[in-house]
């Protein structure tokens, strides 16, 4: 049987300028958010955008977000309550995303808890 860990981190409502979290969430909560229908209209609109600067502005104002690194009173390193034990990796402009995903999933030195392509 696979062992699970209850990681805990802060969840924030859009826009990105909002620095106070509304609650603590875990990996399963984020997974459900990603695969659910809550952000589907925003995701579809974002994927139609041709300009990367327009897309960046849109993401900052239309998507909720979380701080995978831990629980915070406010989104500021000095306001950290507890580190989650997670490390968040963000890869931009990857040519072969399928190959990179497999490398991460099969890596011998760390376990991948959640892996997704952001909108």
Per-range role (PLM):
Residues 1-85:
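DNA replication initiation on ssDNA origins
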Residues 7-13, 91-92, 117-118:
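Short loop/turn segments at strand-loop or loop-helix junctions that form parts
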Residues 90-98:
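Short, surface-exposed ligand-recognition loops at beta-strand->loop->(often short) alpha-helix junctions
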Residues 97-102, 113:
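Short, acidic loop-beta-alpha module within alpha/beta folds
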């Amino acid at each position: 049987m696979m062992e699970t860990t209850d990681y805990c981190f802060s969840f924030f409502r859009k826009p990105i300028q909002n620095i106070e979290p509304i609650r603590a969430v875990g990996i399963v909560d984020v997974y459900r958010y990603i695969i659910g229908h809550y952000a589907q209209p925003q995701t579809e609109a974002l994927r139609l955008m041709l300009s990367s600067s327009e897309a960046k502005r849109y993401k900052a104002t239309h998507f909720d977000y979380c701080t995978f690194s831990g629980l915070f009173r406010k989104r500021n390193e000095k306001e950290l309550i507890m580190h989650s034990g997670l490390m968040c990796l963000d890869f931009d402009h990857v040519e072969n995303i399928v190959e990179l995903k497999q490398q991460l999933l099969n890596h011998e030195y760390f376990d991948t808890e959640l892996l997704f392509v952001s909108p």
